[in-house]
Amino acid sequence: PTLGVLDQRLLYWPIGNGSGIQGKRVVEQWQEAMTAVRLTGGWLAGFIDRPGKRSVLTMLHTLDLDNSGRKISDLYRFDSDIFAGLTDTDLFDTLLQPGERSVVFVDVSQHNNTFAGRDAHNEVCFFYLKTGPGEGHLARVDIPLWVARDKAALGSVHALLVDQCRIIGSYPYVITRADEIAVVGRRDQEELENRIALLLAEQDIHPSATGKQRSKDFARGGKTRFEG
């Protein structure tokens, strides 16, 4: 089977206007694409580098609650105070060794209920993966329920991602390579930037590049294809 790896979460939801007509249609198309992958026999995974969620910590906290009637939404609202800035990354970065993964969890959210309501196989699950030695090399990997329930598929996805991360160090090479291919050529990029600059200048807007963008430009300038 073919594995499709995205550099984002599988539980896609538009920011801001997700409940609008256009937002709902985009989500439906995303879900339809997930179903299409399953029907072709493929696998899906969403790779989130250095995740900042507290899903597992919140779950663990519920086990220590005396008030069983407390709403999950209340836990998420106050989790920053409860955990003093800690995230799931802090937990699993300590527990896992390079190449190891956590058990599989189900994403508990209303958005995930929407996904499962449309196609039960598309309910999003996840696990944490230690992608390299030392601190800071931890990823959250989203997988659909149909992959999570198939032990062979789950094992293969785990092994493939570990193998990909070993090629260039703690990040899947296939995603890096996709970024290389998707990068606009220098001449086209300069033409596009000039047009954007002219439009911004007309509005008396003079933006400066962020540190992140400068680092991406520098890295892309010297990339070469991996020959393994």
Where on the chain are the PLM-derived regions?
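Phosphate-binding glycine-rich loops and their immediate beta-loop-alpha structural context
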Residues: 5
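Long, contiguous domain-sized segments
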Residues: 8-228
